[in-house]
């Protein structure tokens, strides 16, 4: 049985992804008691898996270069970073949406002046406003993008919205939803050939659990 290496996104998706693997019979004891470890081994008669936890943007890099065979990552990351791999499944966890938000008194769709948009996702934002025929200046923000309209850095933001509570607390409103997003399973193209039996088994079993 060939070892399958799986890169999991740290944080928001981690716990729910581990639950899915537990439900298909993977031993997740090391993942549940991880301490400061970076790599976690899981082997039984059904699976031989090596997990590692990385930040979301790095999951695609690990899979793209073949350091990981499978990755679990949000669709938001996939939309922002185009790589060469298979996107095989919607895991239906980590559900949220991309949205445009601003202060209630600002109408970003009126007037001909170039609007300033703050976002962690410039590629997603650029495509959205281009399709609307609106000229924008994109400002890349790594921290709390909600701050940008409040302090006058930007007219609006494009960001992930889960419940909307953070926006409300900061006096912002959603003016339009862009698209729904959730966690996806991605697979390295070469690994799909060289470890076809092992990876196909994981995909089939996860699909059964997710769509049950």
Curated annotation (Swiss-Prot):
GO biological process: L-histidine biosynthetic process
Alphabetized UniProt keyword annotations: Amino-acid biosynthesis, ATP-binding, Cytoplasm, Glycosyltransferase, Histidine biosynthesis, Nucleotide-binding, Transferase
Localization per record: Cytoplasm
PANTHER family given in the database record: ATP PHOSPHORIBOSYLTRANSFERASE (PTHR21403:SF8), ATP PHOSPHORIBOSYLTRANSFERASE ATP-PRTASE (PTHR21403)
Annotated family: Belongs to the ATP phosphoribosyltransferase family. Short subfamily.
UniProt remark on domains: Lacks the C-terminal regulatory region which is replaced by HisZ.
Record-given protein name: ATP phosphoribosyltransferase
Species of the source: Clostridium novyi (strain NT)
